[in-house]
Structures are given as C-alpha cells and as structure tokens.
C-alpha cells in the first residue's frame, strides 16, 4: 500500500453545496459522501414555529461532506472549500482533516489508494 490518504470532513450550510461540488470536481475530486446534520455554535438563536408554538433555538441545519483523497492534494481540497464556503459570518462551518490508514473496496477487495 503506497500513497498517503486523507479524509476531509466539512460541516457547513447546505446553500453552497452544488457550487462546492462543482469546484471540487475541477481539482479532481470524483466522489464524496454527504449527509444532513444539525449543529449549534456561535450563531445566535432564531425563532421557529413548532406545532403552532414559537420556540427559540440555536440548532441549525448543516451539511456534512466527507471526502477521501490520495491523488488530489489535501491542501487543494481545503483551500477550495474555504474559498467557496467563506462568507465571514458565524455558521460558515468547520473543516476537519484526518489521516487514513487504509481503505478497502468491498466489491473488488482492493486496498489502499487503489480502492478509492
């Protein structure tokens, strides 16, 4: 197994997902996983209507995007995400970078960067 692998996890507002996906494609990111999540942080509480009752909440909808790269430099992925997602306001999100020790393709049995 050769080649270093990294997982980039981005938690951000869902609004710019399509733009981010497009820009990541331009640098060679061919696949990613995303899921809807909820979170709270520095943003102020907002008022929601729940079953006819107004409630204040500091929980916001977010998107978690997971990308594992080997051939694409991880710095390019993080710089692209920062460029696309930064508004300068609380709630822009966070980027986490992890080293990956192995990847296994269940269907083919390939391991390491070849499994990506």
From Swiss-Prot:
Keyword Transcription regulation: yes
Short name of any one Pfam family annotated for the protein: P-II
Subunit structure and binding partners: Needs to interact with NrgA in order to localize correctly to the membrane.
Summary of the function given for this chain in its UniProt record: Required for full induction of the nrgAB operon under conditions of ammonium limitation.
Record-level GO BP terms: regulation of nitrogen utilization
Name the record gives this protein: Nitrogen regulatory PII-like protein
Induction notes from the record: The nrgAB operon is activated by TnrA under nitrogen-limited conditions.
Claim: Cell membrane is one of the keywords in the record: yes
CC terms in the record's Gene Ontology section: cytosol; plasma membrane
Lineage, broadest ranks: Bacteria, Bacillati, Bacillota, Bacilli, Bacillales
SMART domains for this protein: P-II (SM00938)
This protein's UniProt keywords: Activator, Cell membrane, Membrane, Transcription, Transcription regulation
GO molecular function: ATP binding; enzyme regulator activity
Family: Belongs to the P(II) protein family.
Organism this protein belongs to: Bacillus subtilis (strain 168)
Traits of the deletion mutant: Cells show no growth phenotype even at acidic pH.
Record's subcellular location: Cell membrane
Main localization (coarse): membrane
Topology in membrane: Peripheral membrane protein
